[in-house]
Amino acid sequence: MKKNRLLFRVIILLILCGAVGFTLYQGFFANKEKMQIGKEAPNFIVTDLEGKKIELKDLKGKGVFLNFWGTWCKPCEKEMPYMNELYPKYKEKGVEIIALDADETDIAVKNFVNQYGLKFPVAIDKGQKIIGTYGVGPLPTSFLIDKDGKVVEQIIGEQTKEQLEGYLKKITP
């Protein structure tokens, strides 16, 4: 009887481990295959919190730092002030920073933007359609897009001010 109970528990544990492993694989690895470095960045249209329409293809000729984030994400919260500090300098040089929130409420995002005094365009990815198109897994995830609209690099995780400045230099036209 005890042997059967132990065997049953081991089988259940293996099934649970397999399910967790598959979920982690889907979340962290499978999505990354969708976006290829060197390929044209998929176009999108969003409206930022100021009511301005942003279409990626309209930004050709500029470098674009495309950041996917969430208000609940502590690493995202840490890097936002660096992006805000560097934005004016690199905007003058032809680089645009666009922050796309992962489908949270307008109020939550506006409160976050006001709290940090963010000056760069912030929009909400309603229904996470752009996140799906770009194959974003964990947040924060950023894409470097060059002046020709090609994806130069994908960065997953929090960035220091120095790292962020290096990335912005990399896509300066």
UniProtKB/Swiss-Prot annotation:
GO cellular component, one term: plasma membrane
Cysteine pairs bridged by disulfides in the record: 73-76
Protein localization: Cell membrane
Record key words, sorted: Cell membrane, Cytochrome c-type biogenesis, Disulfide bond, Membrane, Oxidoreductase, Redox-active center, Signal-anchor, Transmembrane, Transmembrane helix
Keyword Zinc: no
Bilayer-spanning residue ranges: 10-29
Domain Thioredoxin: 35-173
Lineage top rank: taxon: Bacteria
Topological relation to the membrane, as annotated: Single-pass type II membrane protein
Main location: membrane
Gene Ontology biological-process entries: cytochrome complex assembly
Family annotation (SUPFAM superfamilies): Thioredoxin-like
GO MF terms held by the record: antioxidant activity; disulfide oxidoreductase activity
Pathways per UniProt: Protein modification; cytochrome c assembly
Pfam families, A to Z: AhpC-TSA
Family, similarity comment: Belongs to the thioredoxin family. ResA subfamily.
Function comment: Thiol-disulfide oxidoreductase which is required in disulfide reduction during c-type cytochrome synthesis. May accept reducing equivalents from CcdA, leading to breakage of disulfide bonds in apocytochrome c; following this reduction heme can be covalently attached.
Full protein name: Thiol-disulfide oxidoreductase ResA
Species in which this protein is naturally found: Bacillus cereus (strain ATCC 14579 / DSM 31 / CCUG 7414 / JCM 2152 / NBRC 15305 / NCIMB 9373 / NCTC 2599 / NRRL B-3711)
Recorded name of the encoding gene: resA
